[in-house]
Amino acid sequence: MEPQKFGEAPVAMDMPPKVKKGKKPSRKIRALLALIIPIVIWLCLFLVFPYLNLFSYSFWKAGPFDVIKEFNLGNYQKFFSSEHSADPTFFVLLDTLKLALIVTFFTIILSFPLAYFICFKVKRFKQSLYILVIIPLWISYIVRAYSWKIILGSNGILNSFLIWLGVTDQPLDFLLYSQVSVTIAMIHIYLPFVLMPIYTSLEQIPRTLMEASKDLGGNRLKTFWKVVFPLSLPGVISGGTFAFVLSMGDFLAPTLLGGSSSSTMIANIVQQQFGTSNNWPYGAAIGVIILIIVLIVLKVTGSAEKRYSNLDSV
């Protein structure tokens, strides 16, 4: 650098550029991460990893004493070939699907009038009656299922009442330890799960729409079919999905009230494979198949619910 001459203006020296320090995340971002990270960890530990483990098990095979970690499709071949073999698993799945549809249908049929009555006909004790309907959810599942043994048994309340009326001379044996008892118990147990979303949908219907329908000459029946029912369909679909999915995975009701091969459900087969049969890979394969069916149902019902939810904006 040349020395500065006398009388010349001082020359500005080039300063090195300032290094910008990285900005620290704002307080909002840190608070958001503090909320999201625990949720992600929880989902990974209790949802993602278990399902990945189930999926990997389904491609292994059971050995004499332990699981052999060799990739094969034998478990899935065994399941889908059970239609033509002595293994009843495929037919049990079909029976489970049929029973789940029956339970879903009757829970909707019974829940809708009750939810409609509480929502539109009860004025003073609406909340009290609603709480009374969902109180069974606070009672143990086993207690609710076992109570039907007392009601449907040979010396139970229903048979004693029918004999007293003179309808029959002896107890009706088909009421207990059959598919009838399993179906009745499951309808009773899952009824609150269907009623709650239906009631919520009915409560959200603007009363002005119903009044407008009446002003335009619509009677009660026409108002119901043209206004109330279409706007309540999201709740009906949501409740029906609850009933179907829960019915697909139920194994306690068939165990306590079934007592025969005709009332065995697919969840009982899975329980048996992980229990007495000690064939975890085959049980995992059945679990994956059930999971795929449930995901398909959730996709279809979710699309339908979204479609009918758009009616609110029409």
Where are these regions (language model features)?
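Membrane-interfacial helix termini and adjacent extracytoplasmic/periplasmic loops
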Residues: L73, A145-I187, L221, P254-S262
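N-terminal signal-anchor/first transmembrane alpha helix
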Residues: M1-N53, F117, Q127-V133
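Transmembrane alpha-helices
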Residues: I37, I41, L45-L47, I135, ...
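Interhelical loop and adjacent transmembrane-helix boundary motif
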Residues: R27-A31, G63, N75-S85, M248-F251, ...
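Short membrane-interfacial helix/loop motifs at transmembrane-helix boundaries
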Residues: L47-D87, I151, N155-G156, G258-S261, ...
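Transmembrane alpha-helix signature in integral membrane proteins
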Residues: A86-F120
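Non-cytoplasmic
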Residues: P50-Y57, A145, I150, V194-P197, ...
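C-terminal transmembrane helix and the adjacent membrane-cytosol boundary/short C-terminal tail
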Residues: E2-P10, D14, Y199-M210, K214, ...
